[in-house]
C-alpha cells in the first residue's frame, strides 16, 4: 500500500506588525482587554501582498528545502477564505508562480478547518497511487475581511501562510482522522456573502466583513471539538499519552485551556503562537507546525505523534493524528 508523509514544512508572514496598542489608538480597546480575553498581543498585516503572494513564498521555501524540481509536484491545494479573487483560484496562481507545470491546483474553503480538511484530502490523493508529491498550503489575508471599527472581531485576526510538502511513503503516517460540518449553525460565523441583486431583482445587501457570534463559537469549540478528539482517540486506540504535541487552530487561548482540560491532556503539550500572530484561520496550524520544527520541538523523523485540530466557520471541525 501507498501512504503519504509530511517531508517539509514552511511558513511566511507579512512584515507589517500591528500590536494591541496600535489597535487601541484607532478603536475603543486596550492591550489588557484584548490579551486577557484572547491571549493575542500582536498580529502581522499585509500592506500590498495578496493571499497568493504569501502562499507563493511558502511554496518556494518548500521546493528549496526539498530539492525537488517544480515539475515533480503533482498537485497544490491552498486552503483559504480570503482568496485574491473568486476566480482564478489562489492555488492556480501559486502553480504558475513556481512553474509547477505538471500540477493540478485548487482551493479548499473550510475556514479555520481548511488546512486539516485539505491535508486529509491530499493524503487520499497520494494513497490512490496516482500522485507522488503534493503541496498543502493554508494562506490568509484576513485583514481585508475585517471591519476595523469592530473591536469584537478586528482584534482577533492576522495574515500569514504556512504549508507542507507531502510525498509518497511505504509507511502509514496519517494514523486517524475525523472531519465534520454542521451547516445548520453556519450563521454563527460569516463573511463575504454575495448580494442577491440581479438585473431582475434587488435583494439583500452583501455582508463583506467578518461577523461572529463569539459566545456560540466559543461554546462550539469547547464542546464539539473536545468530543470529536476524544472519539478519534478512542476509535484509533491512540491514547492521550501517545500524543507528543497538540497543534490546534490558534483562535483563543481560553479555548485551548478548556479543550486541554476536557480531553485531559497536559496543557504543556498544546503548542501556541497566537500571541504573535492572532487568528490566521487556515494558516494557523501550518504556521505553528513550521515554527515547532524550526525550534526542534517537532523533528520530522517519523517518531512523534501529533494531533492537528481545526475548527471554525461552516461550522466545520476536524482532527488528524499524524506520525511526523
From Swiss-Prot:
- Keyword Protease belongs to the record: no
The record's keywords, sorted A to Z, are: Acyltransferase, Cytoplasm, Fatty acid biosynthesis, Fatty acid metabolism, Lipid biosynthesis, Lipid metabolism, Multifunctional enzyme, Transferase
Region entry ACP-binding, spans: 250-254
A GO molecular function assigned to this protein is: 3-oxoacyl-[acyl-carrier-protein] synthase activity
Instruction: From the UniProt record, give the pathway where this protein acts.
Output: Lipid metabolism; fatty acid biosynthesis
Compartments reported by the entry: Cytoplasm
Active-site residues, record numbering mapped to chain = 112, 249, 279
Q: Which GO terms describe its biological process?
A: fatty acid biosynthetic process
Question: What GO cellular-component annotations does this UniProt entry give?
Answer: cytoplasm
- Lipid biosynthesis is among the record's keywords: yes
Reaction(s) catalysed by this chain, per the record, are:
malonyl-[ACP] + acetyl-CoA + H(+) = 3-oxobutanoyl-[ACP] + CO2 + CoA
Its EC number is 2.3.1.180
Alphabetical list of SUPFAM superfamilies matching this protein: Thiolase-like
Free-text note regarding domains = The last Arg residue of the ACP-binding site is essential for the weak association between ACP/AcpP and FabH.
Quaternary structure and interacting proteins, as annotated: Homodimer.
Q: Known NCBIfam families for this protein?
A: fabH, PRK09352.1
In the record, the note on similarity to other proteins reads: Belongs to the thiolase-like superfamily. FabH family.
Q: What's the protein here called?
A: Beta-ketoacyl-[acyl-carrier-protein] synthase III
